Amino acid sequence: MGNLRVDVITLFPEMFSAITEYGITSRAVKQGLLQVTCWNPRDYTTDRHHTVDDRPFGGGPGMVMKIKPLEDALVSARQATGAAAKVIYLSPQGRKLTQQAVKGLAEQESLILIAGRYEGIDERFIEAHVDEEWSIGDYVLSGGELPAMVLIDAVTRLLPGALGHVDSAEEDSFTDGLLDCPHYTRPEVYADQRVPDVLLSGNHAHIRRWRMKQSLGRTFERRADLLESRSLSGEEKKLLEEYLRERDDS
């Protein structure tokens, strides 16, 4: 896992300034850990209207992105990034993007992301060029740009040196198959609500134990499905039981 180059085929390259100019991803770009390059299919059209879409065969609402502009943009991206880059289409039909999948993508040196628009892209392009399809959830968006940015952000967090603290990525939700624990900062008391005493104790072993207990309990309450695919250790089972007892007694 090292530096990452991401090439994005998109009709709206200006949207990706959110990645290159703000936050952790911007810092990764400045540090040379991440490179994001956009390719606009409109730049590969030959008609005066720069047409990138057409009506679907068989009728129906909406328009479909044409093969040729997409293919020519992909050729340019491949020439810039190399033939080994994995081509990913962001699509509601894809597999759901998980933290485990993000870890796998972070192992790549380069990725080419296809951000579709309209009703989608010509299926023949997908069959000929796309290696993987990924979805960020069971809902429909106006285009693939936001999912592409979600993927880039998630992958960037796993690049060595991208985060300010070496443990930050490991403590994120889902990294260990669990939701994150609650977090608190100053003041110690706000509107009569106190920070849990254990976090003020300075006892790091007790703090780690409390955080794990909270992560287990929160996952059980909010995303029990995550626990079904994770084998709990004896200590983790004990902590979860303790959490549930404390909850029921409160």
From Swiss-Prot:
Question: Which Pfam families does this one have?
Answer: tRNA_m1G_MT
Which enzyme type, at the first EC level? transferase
**Where in the cell?**
Cytoplasm
Question: Mostly located where?
Answer: cytoplasm
GO CC term (a single one): cytosol
Q: Which InterPro entries match?
A: Alpha/beta_knot_MTases (IPR029028), tRNA_m1G_MeTrfase_C_sf (IPR023148), tRNA_m1G_MeTrfase_TrmD (IPR002649), tRNA_m1G_MTases_N (IPR029026), tRNA_MeTrfase_TRMD/TRM10 (IPR016009)
PANTHER family linked: TRNA (GUANINE-N(1)-)-METHYLTRANSFERASE (PTHR46417:SF1)
Q: What is this protein called?
A: tRNA (guanine-N(1)-)-methyltransferase
According to its UniProt entry, this protein's organism is Pseudomonas putida (strain ATCC 47054 / DSM 6125 / CFBP 8728 / NCIMB 11950 / KT2440)
Please state the gene responsible for encoding this protein. Answer: trmD
